[in-house]
């Protein structure tokens, strides 16, 4: 039986929450495999809005939901999110939610360092959410992170805190920021430990059992391919691998278990924060797209930058992310425009190129080459059948498929989960 990995194919905020919820109804297990509470999913179910950051979308439907070892976890943020979702009537128990015991923690000192660095960077800032994601991943690869399993051993916590503070307090001193008190940090961790540890488990074993019983697993990615620490617009990226190759590594299964890779992208392009954005619109059209699409970050509330669909970027995401098919979202936002534009290539130093360059200079200087497509006046909002789409909307979709070299498997026409057109069932592969 096929598994499915859902990943972003742009700069995040593509509408993964709705698609994951739509698929999770038919999945047996939902797994988060990377990122932290810097990314958010908004789910709308029966008129009720749920905003999730760390919790896998499956919890809302009572499905076994796993936070994998590739996720960095702020335990206080996680507990606050659990209580908020419980207050909406959702039952969250250790039978429903399991956290990888080898997942690394985000501590208050990580957010402290994150903000101190951004302030010191001035105009060269990356535009992080300031929630400590990057510093937590640094500690993971630096082999000094505190992991979920460490919460059960006070002696280990004391030793690891001492190691952490030798590193972090030196950095903080250099930035002119206040140092961290070890005793205070230990007290906070000992207080939160009994609230987190009941959810801790050997999740790779559970996933292996699921594999042998041929149950369906949905791997839920955060952010998007162009925020990948290797393949994105470095250094304006997140601190983890967001592409599907990390679904296995970040959850404890082999790469062959990932299955169908569904890339999510909007019918236009958005980005939050700093970094290059070749098709960004600074005119009334860009403003209109932002207003129609309600383009504000789920977690940060920051307005998103808006622009035309960039087929070069999405095609690159398809290639490096192993994307099998695309879920195209927010088509309805483009209703009423007389003409639309699709970026089909870039000009750089007088030459035409068909990829997004790796260098910062190249990324900043590429000029989009546009193809103009006729728009449509008929509303597509809430359409649930391909035959009810305007002919020009279908033409727009088909052109996108040609340019990105991947088929549209799913089309979303509103935030409501049922307002979708299934072209190809990812679980049927």
Curated annotation (Swiss-Prot):
Q: Which InterPro entries match?
A: Adenylosuccin_syn_GTP-bd, Adenylosuccinate_synth_dom1, Adenylosuccinate_synth_dom2, Adenylosuccinate_synth_dom3, Adenylosuccinate_synthetase, P-loop_NTPase
Which parts of the sequence bind Mg(2+)? 13, 40
What EC number(s) is this enzyme filed under?
6.3.4.4
Give binding positions for GTP.
12-18, 40-42, 304, 330-332, 412-414
GO terms for cellular component: cytoplasm
- Primary residence: cytoplasm
Annotated IMP binding lies at: 13-16, 38-41, 129, 143, 223, 238, 302
Keyword tags: Cytoplasm, GTP-binding, Ligase, Magnesium, Metal-binding, Nucleotide-binding, Purine biosynthesis
Q: Which reaction does it catalyse?
A: IMP + L-aspartate + GTP = N(6)-(1,2-dicarboxyethyl)-AMP + GDP + phosphate + 2 H(+)
Tell me how the cofactor is bound: Binds 1 Mg(2+) ion per subunit.
For activity, the cofactor(s) needed are: Mg(2+)
Amino acids binding substrate: 298-304
Residues at the catalytic site: 13, 41
Superkingdom of the source species? Bacteria
Does Kinase count among this protein's keywords?
Answer: no
Q: What class of enzyme is it?
A: ligase
Q: Which CDD domains match?
A: AdSS (cd03108)
Compartment(s): Cytoplasm
Q: Which GO terms describe its molecular function?
A: adenylosuccinate synthase activity; GTP binding; magnesium ion binding
Q: Which GO terms describe its biological process?
A: 'de novo' AMP biosynthetic process; IMP metabolic process
- Quaternary structure? Homodimer.
Q: Which NCBIfam families does this entry report, sorted A to Z?
A: PRK01117.1 (NF002223), purA (TIGR00184)
Q: So what does this one do?
A: Plays an important role in the de novo pathway of purine nucleotide biosynthesis. Catalyzes the first committed step in the biosynthesis of AMP from IMP.
Instruction: Return the similarity comment.
Output: Belongs to the adenylosuccinate synthetase family.
Q: Which HAMAP family does the record cross-reference, listed alphabetically?
A: Adenylosucc_synth
Stated name of the protein? Adenylosuccinate synthetase
This protein's species is Paramagnetospirillum magneticum (strain ATCC 700264 / AMB-1)
